Every structure is written in C-alpha cells, then in structure tokens.
Curated annotation (Swiss-Prot):
Pfam families: Tmp39 (PF10271). It is found in: Membrane. This is Transmembrane protein 39A-A. Keywords: Glycoprotein, Membrane, Transmembrane, Transmembrane helix. Glycans are attached at N31, N39, N180, N206. One of its GO terms (cellular component) is endoplasmic reticulum membrane. The keyword Transmembrane helix applies. It comes from Xenopus laevis. It comes from the Eukaryota. It is a multi-pass membrane protein. Its main location: membrane. Belongs to the TMEM39 family. InterPro entries: Uncharacterised_TMEM39 (IPR019397). The chain crosses the membrane at residues 72-92, 110-130, 155-175, 182-202, 287-307, 319-339, 420-440, 446-466.
Length: 488
C-alpha cells in the first residue's frame, strides 16, 4: 500500500463541522455531553461555538380585553334561582295531574297533585341548594368595612340570625323526614357527602417535590413551608378531622382571585409555575364537578327516591331532565370558576412550557442528538435523549420534562387559548339545540312548560359564551405587530 500521511476521513470532517450544544440552544448543558453518532455514543466537542445558529423563538402574548364577569354574590343568586326553577319543573314532571277532566275528583281541580308532595323534603332540598348563596351573603357582608361598633354588632347579629334560621329549618325538616320515611330512603339524603369525603378529602397530591415559594397565591403558606423544609420526604398522613376541615374550608371559601403571570425566564421557575397552576386548575375542576353533581342530585334525583310506589311518572323524561340540569350546572360553574382571564393565564404558561414528541428508535439517526438538560431552553425541532428514548421539541419554547405526562397534557389542553371556551360552547349549544328540537316535538303540557323554562336559563349562559368567543377570537387573531409588544 502506498505510504504517506492520510487526510481526515469523511466522518471526522462531518463531526468537526457540527456546532456545539451551546451554539444550538444558546446555553450550556448541565451534564457536559455533546452530540451523538449513529451508534448512540456521546461525542465530546472541545471547539468553541462559532455562532448562534439556532435560538429559541421568543414567546409573545396577546392582550385580551377585560370581559365582564358576574360577581360572586350575583352568580350564586342566579345559580340558586336556576336550581329552584329546575326543582319546580321536576315536581311538575312527577306530580302532574289531568286537570282538564271534569271535577269528579279533588286531584283534577289543580294542575298538580299537591296532596302527594312531601313539603318537608322540598324544604330540605331548598336549604341544601341555598348553602352557597348563604355563605356568599356572609362572605360579602364580612368583607364590608365596619366603621362603627353599631355596624359591627348589626353584622354579627345578622349572621347569627341567618345561620340560626337555616339550621333550624334543616333540623326541623330532618326530624319530620325521619318520622315519615324508612331508613333506606333517608340514606339518600346524605349520599353526596358520603361520596365526597372518601373521593376528595382523602386524595393527597404527591408532595415529594418541594413546592416553590413564588406560588404562595395558590397554596397555603403552611404547605410552602412543608415543601421547603421537607424536600425529598413525603408529607405525613393527616387524620380524618383535619382532612374534613380543609375540605369544608375549600367548599365554603369564595373563589380565589386569578393569579398573575410574570413570564419567568428560568426553566425551573417555569416548571414550578406550571405545577402550581395545574394544582389550582385541578382544584377548580373538582369543585365544578362536585357542585354540579350535587345540584343535579338534589334537584332531579332525590325527589324520585321519595315517590310513592303507587305514583306514576315518566321515568325517561325525568332522567332526561336530570342530565340537562347537570350539564347546564356544569357549564355555569365552569364559566364562573374558569373565566377568560384565567384561561389566558394557563395559555401563557403553556406557551413557556412547550412539549416533546416521542420518536421511534432508529428515527433521525443522522441528525444531531443531545442529552436533555433541565437548565436549558430548547428550541423547536431539536432532538434530545431522555430516559433511553428520543424526543423532538414541538413548541417554539421548550422546558418541559420529556417523560412527564402531566406536562404534555397541560400543553395539549392550554396551548390553544380558546380550547376550553370552544368545548363549553359546543356543549351548551348542543344542549340548546336538543331542547329546541324537543320543544318542537313535545305533545304533553308539562314537557312544553319544562323545556320553555329551562331554555330561558340556558339562553343567558349561551349568550355569555358566544360573547366571550367572538371577542377573544378577534383578540387572539390580531397580529402581534399591531400591539407593539416586546417578546418575553
């Protein structure tokens, strides 16, 4: 073979021409690894970066207008009126009479069989439905500043009178129900509380990770101290009374104020903010689900449990009314607890978080691959390896953990700002269309009356959703250059 000095091979030339990780992502990799070859072995690059070839695209946020939202007391009053209307409709469906017949029977003199209605049960249901309104009244009155001793004394007396009246009616109805009904029927009175305690009170989030101190607006200070002092250790299980007190405090407290978004630059701060918002969103969804099911249970299901065996009613129509009440209560509570400003906050946080797409083994074998680092902001299209898997950056700004399913779920739900609003609009619009169709085909007087009354309530909710969708759709479609915004 001819001698002489050999030149660099094609593989060596290709390796030396590739930029380092600092050049690609505009930062340093915490583990000191560089690119990978086809066999998957790491290649250390000692050459300094030439120029910044790929930089993360800056995150820009749209400015949305301030949309009117019902106050806490006004919403609770409207929600209580809606539940009373739905309860009245269910009693019509159960105890309707043939009032157009000749007056040969006392029951035919009126449109309802009033002698079959249990008024103690109706009073008990009304008290249970009014619990949120009563607490909203007390909370609003407590927030008003007391300028004099007389005003403060009047406030205390008014609260005591209101709570005493509700407690007396509640106990009076319970005593009469215990006298007139069997134990099996009485078990249905507290069934929602029996389900809520094991499902919600005993549910403990995984707090092995330290909670960030900059999210104090979302979690109590005690939990922040526990997360800061007990990093790496699990929280001790709490007793039943402590869990019950915390759960009741969450139910009785008014809805928390919408937190603010600070556009953090550190990947750790972004992930901590996402964890706080995720916990807050789960708590709000839990409150929406419980209160909507609670309302539908006491409005439409509990009256069916106390119907006498000799009483005939349309089971299919009553169950249909139950489903309609639950869906509309769910949408009403969602629009109040998940306002547009809060959804925009979740969208901004998801834009900073980003997402990773898992690739199959052997894909992109010729492309540069890096070891994922938690201190690096990854641009779109970069390939990283994490937990023996290959991932591709999807978002323009990526700090999420590739193997964390909750991060991918958070980005999927909130990276489009109108996704939740569109979902609620589709649900409410479908419900209204179905009710209009049922109204056209209704032949019985109680069906026509019940659908007409419910439609008046649903029109208000649908109007608010359509208004928010039109305004926010134009706001998010407006070009960024027109705002004069600076990228974060």
């Amino acid at each position: 073979m001819p001698g002489g000095r050999r030149g660099p091979s094609r593989q060596q030339l290709s390796r030396s021409a590739l930029p380092s990780l600092q050049t690609l992502v505009g930062g340093t990799c915490g583990n000191g690894t560089g690119l990978r070859n086809r066999n998957g072995s790491a290649i250390g690059l000692s050459a300094p970066p030439i120029t910044a070839l790929i930089t993360p695209e800056p995150v820009r946020h749209c400015r949305i207008p301030e949309l009117p939202v019902d106050g806490g007391l006004l919403f609770e009053f409207l929600f209580f009126i809606y539940l009373l209307v739905a309860l009245f409709i269910q009693y019509i469906n159960i105890y309707k009479s043939v009032w157009w017949y000749p007056y040969n029977h006392p029951a035919s003199c009126t449109s309802l069989n009033f002698h079959l209605i249990d008024y103690h049960l109706a009073a008990f249901i009304t008290v249970m439905l009014a619990r949120r309104l009563v607490w909203a009244l007390i909370s609003e009155a407590s927030q008003v500043g007391t300028s004099s001793v007389v005003h403060y004394t009047t406030l205390i007396i008014g609260r005591l009178v209101l709570l005493t009246l509700c407690g007396w009616i509640f106990c009076w109805t319970l005593v009469n129900l215990f006298r007139n009904h069997s134990l099996l029927n009485l078990l249905f009175l507290g069934y929602p509380f029996g389900v809520y305690v094991p499902l919600c009170c005993f549910h403990q989030d995984n707090r092995s990770q330290p909670l960030p101190t900059d999210c104090g607006y979302l979690v109590p200070d005690s939990l922040v101290d526990e997360g800061a002092n007990g990093a790496g250790s699990l929280v001790r299980p709490k007793d039943f009374l402590s869990l019950l007190r915390e759960s009741l405090r969450e139910q009785l407290n008014s809805a928390p104020s919408v937190p603010s978004h600070s556009c953090p630059l550190s990947p750790d701060l972004i992930r901590n903010e996402v964890e706080c918002l995720k916990s807050d969103f789960n708590r709000r969804i839990k409150e929406v689900l419980f209160n909507s099911l609670f309302s539908a249970y006491y409005v439409a299901f509990l009256p069916l449990c106390f119907v006498k065996s000799t009483q005939y009613y349309d089971m299919r129509w009553s169950c249909e009314h139950l489903i309609m009440v639950w869906i509309n209560a769910f949408v009403m509570l969602s629009t109040q607890l998940l306002p547009p400003k809060y959804c925009d906050l979740l969208h901004r946080s998801a834009s900073h978080l980003g997402k990773w797409q898992k690739l199959e083994h052997g894909a992109y074998s010729n492309a540069p691959q890096h070891i994922w680092s938690e201190n690096t902001v990854w641009p779109q299209g970069v390939l990283v390896r994490h937990s023996r898997s290959l991932y591709k950056a999807v978002g323009p700004y990526n700090v999420a953990v590739p193997s964390e399913v909750s991060h991918a779920r958070f980005y999927f739900l909130f990276h489009r700002p109108l996704r939740l609003l569109n979902l609620l609009l589709v649900i409410e619009g479908s419900l209204v269309l179905y009710q209009l169709y049922s109204l056209l085909r209704a032949e019985k007087w109680n069906h026509t009356l019940s659908i007409a009354l419910i439609l008046f309530c649903n029109y208000y909710v649908l109007f608010k959703l359509l208004r928010d969708r039109i305004v926010l759709g134009r706001a998010y479609s407006y070009p960024f250059s027109s705002y004069g915004l600076k990228p974060h």
